Amino acid sequence: HTRQIEFIEGIIMRIETERLNIIALTPEQLELWTHSIGELEKELLCSYKAEPMEGLFREIVCGQAEKAKKDPDNYLWHTFWFITKKTDLCVVGSVDFKDVPNSDGEVEIGYGLGREFEHNGYMTETVQAFCNWALQQDKLKHIIAETDVDGASSQRILTRCGFKEYARNDTVWWRL
């Protein structure tokens, strides 16, 4: 599986896998996503069929958009990346890091997939490529993730990508 990384003006904008393009949204595109998916689809020439932009998810994306705007040098750690199928340019999900790496060199990953695209290996393919890219960045030593105790699908993705469980209480914590 060849993974290509495209650089535009020195900034990574896209990670390519066998079936997917993982595209970093600009701070402006993040904002557009929260209030006008149709406009964003036109700009990116894609069709959005991933998680509905509502409720807690919308609040999270709005918060990340603010961080991305305030910290442009680190926006790739704050933005969401669209997971787009190469065959039909359909956005099936998104992936992000929740902040810049902390003082221990750790960053937390988050991800979600539209229901109709589950159980096709898209998220495993995405998490693997996304983590491979991240681990090549300066100062990053580990990627961590939090799952629900009963989140078997998410836990399988992390296990397939080499994550190991390191803590369990109300949720389960994983580290790569």
Task: Describe these PLM feature segments.
Residues 158:
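Conserved active-site tyrosine of GNAT-family acetyltransferases
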Residues 119-124:
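Glycine-rich acyl-CoA binding loop
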Residues 145-155:
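Conserved beta-strand-loop-alpha-helix junction that forms the acyl-donor binding cleft
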Residues 3-108, 113-116, 129-133, 137, ...:
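GNAT-family acyltransferases
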